[in-house]
């Protein structure tokens, strides 16, 4: 009886979530024609909030392994936006070793925060903000030999003051085009509508690409995708997510590059 109640609750949650995601934007003949003059897309995978410091089936390390070895495109490279000082993240010895492993695997180490917790940078005073930026840059430089050039602010929230501080530290803000919406780490962190979610989001991005709003870099249009590598559900489904992204491109009428991932 208890298992039935749990299953019913999960089903009810899935049904409620299904109402939050609309159908993909319809591909019109006009959009289809405009896309013919656009470069193919290539997915740029990014990961927030890591590295995990867990000693049990570490999700960040699982993600790195799946990017290296998968049936879609072995050797995918990603950008990891890191919490370099959090005790359950990069501030631990295991977290530091995971960051070193990510860099050794050819991935880009980028800055998320160097606060003890996932603190909104807008809440920090000037001295605290300067301190976390300097500390985070030093943490990453100790691994890579150079300070990071990319930042994704906690909660993706910044203002003129924090943006100016990022610029002083040589950091460029990178947000996202697509999101797995997997930022909930504790409790129910699954994504029963993950396929519909990405179909819908890519169809919206497709409309922008058709209008020439996304830049072309080296013959392809990068489409930034965001996951959370500390989410165990995401880590378990990483290879499936790779296939979903390819399926999303096909369903929405998008051309992908010969190598669809970086």
Protein language model regions, located:
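Catalytic domains of cell-wall/extracellular-matrix polysaccharide-remodeling enzymes
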Residues: 90, 94, 116-262
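Residues in flexible loops and secondary-structure boundaries
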Residues: 8-9, 161
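Active-site beta->alpha N-cap acidic-glycine motif
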Residues: 22-108, 115-117, 137-142, 146-148
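Bacterial N-terminal signal peptides that target proteins for export
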Residues: 1-8
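C-terminal motif of bacterial Sec signal peptides marking the signal peptidase cleavage site
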Residues: 17-19
């Amino acid at each position: 009886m208890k298992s039935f109640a749990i299953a019913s609750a999960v089903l009810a949650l899935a049904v409620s979530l299904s109402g939050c995601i609309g159908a993909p934007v319809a591909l019109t003949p006009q959009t289809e024609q405009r896309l013919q003059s656009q470069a193919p897309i290539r997915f740029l995978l990014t990961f927030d909030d890591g590295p995990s410091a867990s000693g049990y089936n570490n999700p960040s390390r699982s993600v790195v392994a799946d990017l290296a070895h998968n049936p879609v495109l072995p050797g995918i490279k990603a950008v990891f936006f890191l919490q370099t000082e959090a005790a359950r993240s990069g501030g631990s010895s295991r977290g530091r070793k995971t960051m070193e492993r990510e860099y050794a695997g050819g991935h880009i180490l980028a800055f998320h925060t160097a606060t003890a917790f996932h603190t909104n940078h807008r809440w920090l005073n000037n001295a605290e903000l300067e301190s976390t930026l300097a500390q985070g840059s030093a943490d990453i430089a100790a691994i890579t030999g150079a300070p990071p050039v990319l930042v994704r602010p906690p909660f993706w929230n910044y203002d003129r003051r924090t943006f100016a501080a990022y610029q002083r530290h040589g950091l460029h803000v990178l947000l996202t085009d697509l999101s797995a919406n997997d930022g909930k780490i504790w409790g129910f962190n699954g994504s029963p509508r993950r396929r519909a979610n990405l179909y819908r989001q890519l169809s919206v991005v497709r409309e922008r690409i058709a209008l020439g709003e996304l830049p072309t870099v080296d013959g392809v249009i990068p489409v930034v995708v965001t996951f959370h590598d500390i989410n165990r559900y995401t880590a378990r489904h990483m290879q499936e997510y790779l296939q979903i992204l390819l399926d999303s491109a096909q369903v929405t009428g998008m051309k992908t590059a010969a190598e669809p991932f970086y």
